[in-house]
UniProtKB/Swiss-Prot annotation:
GO terms for cellular component: chromosome; nucleus; site of DNA damage. Its main location: nucleus. Residues 155-203 form a coiled coil. The keyword Ubl conjugation applies. GO terms for biological process: protein ubiquitination; response to UV; transcription-coupled nucleotide-excision repair. It comes from the Eukaryota. Residues 240-258 have a biased composition (Basic and acidic residues). Residues 653-667 have a biased composition (Basic residues). Residues 259-272 have a biased composition (Acidic residues). Monoubiquitinated at Lys-395 in response to transcription stress; this promotes efficient transfer of TFIIH to stalled RNA polymerase II. This is UV-stimulated scaffold protein A. Residues 478-494 have a biased composition (Low complexity). Factor involved in transcription-coupled nucleotide excision repair (TC-NER), a mechanism that rapidly removes RNA polymerase II-blocking lesions from the transcribed strand of active genes. Acts as a key adapter that promotes recruitment of factors involved in TC-NER. Facilitates the ubiquitination of the elongating form of RNA polymerase II (RNA pol IIo) at DNA damage sites, thereby promoting RNA pol IIo backtracking and access by the TC-NER machinery to lesion sites.
Length: 721
């Protein structure tokens, strides 16, 4: 066997199986078949190459390899014998007969491979089943043991069909539960929906008096047709036609009159046109009038229809938010599942009725009033409790004057008589038992309850009231003189200026030497010496104070760091890079990649000869320390001979030629299995399981555990947790 043809066959098989194409390249496949015709040894080598590719964990490689098997299987008896000898392993790698060894990804290609393999095995059995016993056994194994349906277009296995049946049963069970729930809801809610429709229709009919049946489509159509018939006649002719029609009815009832009398009566009934025009003063029978009548009906909310409008608004909200979505869900479930016609008809009629009543509501164009909501706000410091509620506008029709016979009932004093005093007396203020604003009954009850809670010493309201009184003491009732007032005002003004100055002034930390500047420190360098360190037994001796000289020196001295003036770095590293450029880092002393920075020229060569000699010695030393087998040229030769990557292309550092360490893909045409799909789950995983995020979470959890252990370190109960 020629080694050149052997290598060429290996290269062709690798190129065909790693192309990633759904179909084989016929030109290269012809070369493979041409080499296999030479000798059986090439077929043996081809068989081993194919089985190696079928064991790869990539569905695209297996699909291309199986297509090559199908091409050679029908042309070589020797290849058929080799393949059928190891037919069980071949089925495991292509048909997925072993559940513990599923086909590798991508899933779509794996599904296509399994379908193609089952169809091909069926065609092989039909053609070569009688000649090859193991092929027939393999076919019956798939059909009877693995329950493969060869007539199925998708050629699904037993496990797939079971999964599909379970999924279908689960969907049927879910739909059945939804159907039962919809039927139960329909039985319970139908009466309520019909009552809501009746109430809303009645309210709309009361708001818009429909004397002309505007909401009835049949009546509206009949009215429009009669209007169109009469639109071509003048107004006076319409009256004449009505009068003429009435008299014609009278003529039909009178059947005993002769033809002459009927003609005379007809002549008498028809008025003279000229006489009619002269009597009415009209110039012509036909006149054209243009009237702009608004077709939109608009209902305004007033005091008279306020109750109706509120009811319509509540019912409209109930229909739009509750009833209509519920009925639509019923119709959707009934459509998917398929129910009896009567149930579907009832649901459809309910839906149409709800939509019709909503169209009526839109036709009315109701102008709702703005509703004011009474909101309680939190009282600020220094405010009275009476200001906790928002002011309510006066009600329409309210009269501030209260009659005399009702003043006692309202708790007001009687108005003095006008005979005793010449001036008009003002009504006295009402007697208020508790600080409750007369807003409404609910507000008064709320304020009364708050007052009761303040009187109860066990409530939090009483404690808050005491704290408010302490923070904001009541002003004294005595009237100060002018001098005290001026003193207080001057002190307040000085305090305000100090506060402003302290607010603007920066806060700088200082030591004890500045705190006791110009004074003698009382406890400078003195510490208390405890002779006994026992936990329970303490001696009777008095603890003595000892002066520490180091501490005294620290209290009297200060160390001030002089930072100096910042000088920016103007030089660059300029060390040669693997890609041919120069290092642009501007470190002050040392570059983290190229060591100490030395002066270099524009080409990156050292300016000083001493630096050049030192760099040459360091380079020679590194080469001597490196083993001989790490020589790049030797490694490249070994790689070319063995076909394995020994790392000759890898360089120390950031990579070369600007690739930043990214190696070239060996088979770029194949689908990258390591590349994750850009889904929401992958994006969330990338953010949540990021190293920095995990580190921050770990630090926070460690701090929490540390605080817990420090707090409960001496309690044996928490030591067990």
């Amino acid at each position: 066997m020629d080694q050149t043809m052997r290598d060429k066959l290996s290269q062709l098989v690798e190129e065909l199986t790693t192309s990633g194409e759904p179909q084989l390249n016929q030109d290269k496949m012809k070369e493979v078949k041409k080499i296999c015709r030479v000798s059986d040894s090439y077929i043996d080598h081809f068989y081993h190459l194919i089985m190696t590719q079928l064991n790869q964990e990539h569905a695209e490689i297996r699909l291309s390899a199986f297509q090559m098997v199908n091409e050679v299987f029908s042309r070589s008896h020797h290849f058929r014998v080799l393949l059928i000898t190891n037919f069980q392993e071949f089925l495991e790698l292509t048909v997925e007969t072993d559940a513990e060894q599923p086909l590798p990804p991508p899933k779509e290609v794996a599904r296509k491979l399994r379908t193609l393999a089952i169809q091909t095995v069926q065609s092989w059995h039909a053609t070569y089943g009688e000649a090859y016993k193991k092929l027939s056994l393999g076919y019956h194994f798939l059909k009877q043991i693995k329950k493969v349906d060869f007539q199925d277009v998708e050629a699904r296995t037993l496990a797939e069909r079971k999964r599909q049946e379970e999924k279908q049963k689960r969907l049927e069970r879910i739909y059945k539960e939804k159907l039962d729930k919809a039927k139960q809801e329909m039985e319970e809610m139908t009466s309520g929906i019909e009552e809501t429709l009746t109430e809303m229709n009645n309210c709309i009919r009361l708001l818009a008096t429909d004397d002309f049946n505007l909401f009835d489509e049949d009546s509206a159509a009949s009215i429009s047709t009669t209007a169109e018939d009469q639109s071509d006649q003048p107004c006076c002719s319409k009256d004449l036609s009505n009068e003429h029609n009435g008299k014609m009815m009278e003529k039909k009832t009178d059947k005993e009159q002769t033809d002459e009398s009927s003609d005379e009566s007809d002549m008498e009934e028809v008025p003279d046109e000229d006489a009619f025009l002269r009597s009415t003063g009209l110039m012509s029978y036909r006149y054209q009038l243009e009237l702009d009548v608004s077709a939109d009906l608009k209902v305004r909310e007033t005091e008279e229809n306020e109750a109706l409008v509120n009811t319509v608004r509540d019912l409209h909200r109930l229909v739009t938010t509750r009833h209509l979505p519920l009925v639509q869900s019923w119709v959707q479930v009934f459509t998917k599942v398929g129910v009896e016609e009567e149930l579907m008809r009832r649901a459809t009629e309910l839906k149409k009725s709800l939509e019709h009543v909503l169209r009526k509501h839109e036709y009315l164009h109701i102008d709702y009033k703005d509703r004011e909501r009474l909101v309680m706000r939190a009282p600020e410091d220094g405010e009275d409790d009476d200001d906790d509620f928002v002011d309510v506008p006066e009600k329409e029709g309210y009269e501030p004057h209260i009659p005399e016979h009702l003043r006692t009932e309202y708790g007001l004093d009687e108005t003095p008589s006008t005979s005793t005093s010449g001036t008009k007396a003002k009504p006295s203020r009402p007697v208020v038992k508790c600080a409750v604003p007369p807003v409404s009954s609910s507000l008064s009850r709320l304020k009364r309850r708050m007052c009761d809670e303040e009187q109860d010493p066990t409530c939090a309201a009483a404690t808050l009231r005491v704290l408010k009184q302490k923070l904001h003491p009541a002003p004294s009732t005595s009237v100060p003189d002018g001098s005290s007032e001026s003193a207080v005002s001057s002190s307040d003004q000085s305090n305000m200026t100090k506060n402003k100055a302290s607010f603007k002034a920066p806060v700088i930390p200082f030591g004890m030497d500045l705190y006791y500047w110009g004074e003698e420190q009382p406890t400078a360098g003195k510490i208390i010496k405890q002779t006994s360190q026992h936990q329970f037994w303490v001696p009777h001796e008095v603890e003595e104070e000892v002066e520490n000289k180091e501490l005294s020196a620290q209290m009297k001295s200060r160390c001030i760091t002089y930072a100096g003036k910042f000088k920016p770095v103007e030089h660059k590293c300029k060390a040669p890079m693997p890609n041919g450029s120069l290092c642009e880092r501007q470190d002050r002393v040392k570059c983290p990649f190229h060591g100490h920075i030395i002066p270099r020229d524009e080409l990156g060569r050292p300016v000083n000869p001493e630096d050049a000699l030192r760099l040459e010695r360091e380079k020679r030393k590194r080469e001597e320390e490196q083993p001989d087998w790490r020589d790049p040229e030797l490694m490249r030769e070994i790689e070319a001979a063995t076909g394995e990557d020994l790392g000759s292309s890898k360089t120390y550092g950031k990579g070369k030629k600007g690739n930043k360490g990214k190696s070239k893909k060996k088979y770029p045409n194949l689908t990258d299995l390591k590349q994750k799909a850009n889904t929401s789950r992958s994006r969330l995983e990338k953010k949540v399981f990021n190293k920095s995020s995990m580190r921050r979470v770990t630090e926070v959890m460690n701090k929490m555990d540390k605080r817990k252990h420090e707090k409960f370190a001496n309690q044996f109960n928490y030591a067990l947790n």
